[in-house]
Regions:
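Conserved beta-strand scaffold positions in the cores of enzyme catalytic domains, especially
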Residues: 1, 92-94, 114-118
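Von Willebrand factor
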Residues: 1-12, 19-57, 60-64, 70-72, 91-104, ...
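Short, flexible, mixed-charge acidic loops at enzyme active sites
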Residues: 12-19, 107-109
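Mixed-charge (Asp/Glu-Lys/Arg
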Residues: 73, 77-82, 149
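Arginine/glycine-rich "motif VI" loop of SF2 helicases in the C-terminal RecA-like domain
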Residues: 81-90
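Von Willebrand factor A/integrin I-like adhesion domains
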Residues: 99-160
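Extended acidic, low-complexity intrinsically disordered regions
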Residues: 122, 140-197
Length: 197
């Protein structure tokens, strides 16, 4: 878990889903999204988080924010999108917490407005993270032949279907349509390259 309030700091190391335990996060400080993206760019590599002799799972990255960026996130986002193949191919989901969250920015970071879910209470947030984590694990264990954005959308839709079984949850899925999705498709799938960090 990478907290980005005043600066960015890892408050939980990389954890498998089976070992993850949710602790309530406290909002505080500013929203240094650029610092968080720079820190993620450093750690999302074979020399840091993705050390394995047996293979790698595609990362699932969940962004949560209750505000709008207070630093220059655009340069950091451009840099991580252009230089980090793990980020580029990761399944990215964004959670807008409360009315003050900048959904447009979260859509840019996740690459698709449909990968953004708005929540307004802690219980819904906890359930969303749990269900999205399990769903992400199941979907990312399949073959990666479709686009990464489609995987995020599939995860969100599956998660929302699971959450809709509980009638008192307050979520909104991809309602704002102002951000343009990033084009992540190309003829080169990048998996055969040796230049992954």
């Amino acid at each position: 878990v990478l907290r980005f309030a005043s600066g960015a700091e890892w408050i939980k190391p990389l954890t498998s889903l089976d070992d993850f335990f949710w602790n309530d996060l406290k909002a505080g400080g500013v929203t240094d999204l650029g610092s968080a993206l720079n820190e993620l760019n450093k750690k999302l590599s074979r020399s840091e988080f993705l050390q394995s002799d047996t293979g790698f799972c595609i990362p699932v990255i969940m962004f949560m924010s209750d505000g709008e960026p207070t630093d220059d996130y655009t340069k950091a986002l451009k840099n991580i999108n252009e230089t980090n193949k793990w980020f580029k191919h990761a399944t990215k989901i964004a959670i807008a917490v409360g009315d003050g969250a900048d959904v447009d920015v979260l859509a840019k970071v996740s690459g698709n407005i449909e990968a953004v879910v708005s929540v307004n209470d802690v219980e819904t947030l906890k359930m969303l993270i749990k269900v999205a984590s399990v769903t992400s694990s199941m979907i990312n264990s399949k073959s990666r032949t479709s686009s990464d954005t489609n995987n995020a959308v599939e995860i969100i839709k599956t998660t929302m279907n699971e959450l809709n079984d509980a009638s008192d949850l307050d979520t909104h899925f991809g309602e704002e349509k102002t951000a343009e999705p990033q084009n992540t498709s190309s003829s080169d799938d990048g998996w055969s390259d040796d230049d992954w960090n």
